[in-house]
């Protein structure tokens, strides 16, 4: 079945950089950022899910639920469109039933262009758009997340489902995918690899968020399978996102005990970078958030990025967290925006750090921030009332 490409393309906000491919800021070395123009600033590939959220009430005691549309790969596209004004698209599975209608409406409302491989629902069993169940926790009570991904349409996606030469031939500056989609099935991982090859052939930057999810990988062969799949994909990327735990669990990199280290100490992460670039010489930039969890609603928050032998660390802020889900995707979006806009490594990391923090102050998985709020926080702004 041929994919459906639909939805308006919004005009992008003017980037800071000028025309012509350029290195993404001082210290980011050989990461050549395509100039503005073309059809899309970013194309994401991944599954889209419905998250049912009872707030701070444990799920088993809930009487009401908020519905969020989410997905690690989709969230990045949604954040870049809604907050940063970039032209983005999501290549994903769509099911022709009312849940699909809800998801489609939310995708378009965020300003993201949908590119669908459509599936017909049989009225009883599926295929389905996956459901994620969560409660936010509170104080000393941690958040809880579990899934129903039975007969998930996104897991049926396979090479050949999308016309990558046509999509990238219209000029896409950045391609993004992640470990959550890669974990769904053998065919979903193969589809990412197919898209990455097409992206490179067209001159797009390729990024991968490791986003290791043990519960999902357990259904697809566990860590050994993750190492095999994610290792193949990491070999094809320019920008790798993930902390030291992701590097160990998803890629099998040896490293110090994550539990024993401070969440704010970048040394464990930076100490593993030499291994990363030795094993994956194509990787030019690696970045992650750093956090120390004091309680469910109070975190110390920082971030670190490495590019071509240079590392930068964001300041540490005390962050009041409303809904933790989506903060990492908010970080990824801020980083990509900064790099596409011609920012240097430190400025791009600051934008990522600021936007990721802001996303955790809203309900749901995607941004409600404005670019002005992100820039203000990145510069060291405060929560004083704006009049």
Which residue ranges define each predicted feature?
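Catalytic-core regions built around general acid/base machinery
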Residues: 190-203, 228-236
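Conserved post-catalytic alpha-helical subdomain immediately downstream of the catalytic base
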Residues: 296, 312-381, 385-387
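Positively charged, low-complexity intrinsically disordered leader regions
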Residues: 2-15, 20-60
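Short catalytic helix/loop segments, enriched in acidic residues and glycine
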Residues: 58-78
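Alpha-helix C-terminal capping segments
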Residues: 68, 76-87, 109, 338-341
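Conserved phosphate/ATP/ADP-binding segment of small-molecule kinases
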Residues: 215-309
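Conserved N-terminal subdomain of the carbohydrate kinase-like
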Residues: 87-179, 374-387
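Hydrophobic faces of well-ordered beta-strands that scaffold small-molecule active sites
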Residues: 90, 206-208, 240
């Amino acid at each position: 079945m041929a994919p459906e490409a639909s939805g308006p393309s919004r005009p992008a906000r003017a980037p800071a950089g000028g025309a012509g491919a350029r290195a993404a800021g001082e210290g980011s070395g050989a990461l050549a950022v395509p100039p503005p123009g073309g059809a899309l600033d970013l194309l994401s590939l991944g599954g889209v899910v419905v998250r049912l959220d009872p707030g701070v009430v444990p799920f088993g005691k809930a009487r009401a639920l908020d519905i969020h549309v989410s997905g690690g790969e989709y969230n990045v596209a949604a954040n870049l469109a809604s907050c940063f004004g970039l032209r983005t698209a999501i290549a994903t599975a769509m099911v022709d039933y009312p849940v699909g209608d809800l998801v489609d409406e939310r995708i378009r409302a965020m300003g993201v262009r949908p590119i669908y491989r459509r599936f017909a629902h049989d009225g009883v069993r599926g295929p389905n758009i996956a459901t994620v169940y969560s409660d936010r926790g509170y104080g000393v009570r941690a958040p809880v997340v579990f899934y129903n991904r039975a007969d998930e349409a996104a897991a049926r996606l396979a090479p050949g489902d999308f016309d990558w030469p046509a999509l990238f031939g219209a000029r896409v500056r950045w391609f993004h995918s992640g470990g959550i989609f890669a974990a769904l099935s053998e065919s979903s991982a193969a589809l990412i690899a197919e898209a990455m090859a097409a992206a490179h052939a067209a001159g797009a930057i390729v990024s991968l968020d490791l986003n290791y999810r043990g519960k999902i990988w357990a259904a697809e062969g566990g860590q050994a399978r993750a190492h095999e799949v994610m290792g193949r994909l990491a070999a094809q990327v320019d920008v790798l996102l993930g902390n030291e735990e992701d590097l160990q669990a998803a890629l099998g990199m040896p490293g110090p005990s994550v539990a024993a280290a401070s969440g704010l100490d970048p040394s464990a992460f930076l100490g593993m970078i030499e291994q990363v670039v030795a094993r994956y010489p194509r990787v030019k930039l690696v970045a992650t958030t750093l956090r120390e969890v004091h309680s469910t609603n109070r975190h110390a928050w920082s971030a670190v990025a490495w590019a071509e032998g240079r590392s930068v660390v964001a300041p540490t802020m005390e962050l009041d967290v409303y809904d933790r889900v989506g903060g990492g995707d908010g970080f990824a979006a801020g980083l990509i925006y900064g790099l596409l806009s011609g920012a240097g490594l430190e400025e791009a990391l600051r934008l990522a750090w600021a936007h990721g923090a802001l996303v955790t102050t809203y309900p749901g998985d995607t941004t409600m921030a404005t670019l002005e709020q992100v820039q203000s926080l990145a510069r060291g702004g405060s929560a004083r009332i704006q009049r």
